[in-house]
Amino acid sequence: MTDFELAVSSEMVFTELPIIDRVHRIHDMGFAVEIWSWHDKDLAALAATGARFTSMTGYLHGDLIDPLTCDDVVRTAELSIKAAETLGVSRLNLHTAELVDGHAARPRQRATGEMWLTALRTL
């Protein structure tokens, strides 16, 4: 049998509750917790819940595929690493494009070769 752990996104369930209460409820149900953004949350309060946090967004601004904003991804990833350490998170998610309220800030319908190369250089 393979050991695995199920995690629930605290951003997607029990949305009528404050984030701390969502985390408590998920933890009480026996699941690990995921969060998206961390900059708008009380990290010390989240850590004090005793929940196990498994992943979170690993940057705050910028697009991996945009040469004008890709440096923002790297700069804010450094901040995200420090935040992740507070929660014991070992996995950070990077998306090709910045998210605002869970949606792409600058939606693009098709990736070009130049976009792929920019993402490669950024990473």
Where are these regions (language model features)?
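Acidic (Asp/Glu)-rich catalytic clusters
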Residues: 1-3, 21-28, 40-58, 78-88, ...
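Hydrophobic faces of well-ordered beta-strands that scaffold small-molecule active sites
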Residues: 4-10, 31-35, 53-58, 92-94
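A short, structure-level motif marking secondary-structure boundaries and short turns
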Residues: 6-8, 27-29, 64-66, 108-111
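Short, Lys/Arg-rich amphipathic segments at extreme N-termini
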Residues: 4-22
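Active-site acidic/histidine proton-transfer and metal-coordination neighborhood
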Residues: 66-123
